[in-house]
Amino acid sequence: MSLEARKAQARQAAFARRKAAHALDDGCCSSALSGVLAGYRGVPLAGYMAMRTEIDPLAAMEEAAAHGPVGVPVITGKGQPLTFARWVPGGAMVDGTFGAQVPAEMALMEPEILVVPLVAFSRAGGRLGYGGGFYDRTLEQLRARRATLAIGFAYAAQEDPDLPLEPTDQPLDMVVTEEGVIEVGKV
């Protein structure tokens, strides 16, 4: 089976697990993320506006915005890295590419921490996204300039120890789930 076929199969299984976990989400997951982000108060960070069954980081983003700049990703074109627009709680939002909400006014910012949505993850820091490569290109670009922390935010059910990965896949530094924090590279 080709790598692309293995990735498609892994995505399909992970989407089903994520959907089931999302149905049980009582909204407490964001507190674990808030706890992690509290150690980085004031550091520019980017979250994301959850879509469909993605775990929602909004409460943690609102808390972080009280201490420093928070952005959300903006897709500028196929094959391009993401840019980030400054987000403020309660600010006007509009539909962006693929239906993700983006700020109505685009004040660009550069994050040092990315809270990353995903379809599946591994404890080794592997991340399977939707297949567009946006976060891989973005992390590669940001990490070429400075240390950039990538925090996966997911349901524990999205873990896949046999994640099919490519050399261009950028690793996560940690993963936050409703069951706790997984620090990549630490036993």
For each predicted feature, which ranges?
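N-terminal active-site beta-alpha-beta segment that forms phosphate/nucleotide-binding
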Residues: 1-110
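Surface-exposed, charge/polar-rich loops and edge strands
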Residues: 1-5, 9, 16-20, 105, ...
